C-alpha cells in the first residue's frame, strides 16, 4: 500500500511539473501566435 501511495504521488507530481513547465513554455510562445489561434 505504501509503495502504491509513493508511485501515485510521483505520477501526480510528474504531471503537475509537466503542466507547469508546458504552461510556462507556452505562455511566451502564445503571445505572438495569438493571432494564429484566432
Swiss-Prot record:
User: What compartments host this protein?
Assistant: Cellular thylakoid membrane
**Which InterPro entries does the entry mention?**
PSII_PsbI (IPR003686), PSII_PsbI_sf (IPR037271)
Instruction: Please name the Pfam families in this protein's record.
Output: PsbI
**Entry superkingdom:** Bacteria
Q: What is its main location?
A: membrane
What is the disulfide pattern of this chain? none
What is this entry's stated membrane topology?
Single-pass membrane protein
Please verify whether the record's keywords include S-adenosyl-L-methionine. Answer: no
Q: Which UniProt keywords apply?
A: Membrane, Photosynthesis, Photosystem II, Reaction center, Thylakoid, Transmembrane, Transmembrane helix
Q: Name one GO cellular component term.
A: photosystem II reaction center
Q: Spell out the NCBIfam families in the cross-references.
A: PRK02655.1
Family per similarity comment: Belongs to the PsbI family.
State whether it acts alone or in a complex, and with which partners, per the record: PSII is composed of 1 copy each of membrane proteins PsbA, PsbB, PsbC, PsbD, PsbE, PsbF, PsbH, PsbI, PsbJ, PsbK, PsbL, PsbM, PsbT, PsbX, PsbY, PsbZ, Psb30/Ycf12, peripheral proteins PsbO, CyanoQ (PsbQ), PsbU, PsbV and a large number of cofactors. It forms dimeric complexes.
What is its biological role? Answer: One of the components of the core complex of photosystem II (PSII), required for its stability and/or assembly. PSII is a light-driven water:plastoquinone oxidoreductase that uses light energy to abstract electrons from H(2)O, generating O(2) and a proton gradient subsequently used for ATP formation. It consists of a core antenna complex that captures photons, and an electron transfer chain that converts photonic excitation into a charge separation.
Q: What is this protein called?
A: Photosystem II reaction center protein I
Q: What is the lineage of its organism?
A: Bacteria, Bacillati, Cyanobacteriota, Cyanophyceae, Oscillatoriophycideae
Amino acid at each position: 500500500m505504501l509503495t502504491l501511495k509513493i508511485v501515485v504521488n510521483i505520477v501526480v507530481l510528474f504531471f503537475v511539473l509537466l503542466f507547469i513547465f508546458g504552461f510556462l513554455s507556452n505562455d511566451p510562445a502564445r503571445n505572438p501566435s495569438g493571432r494564429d489561434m484566432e
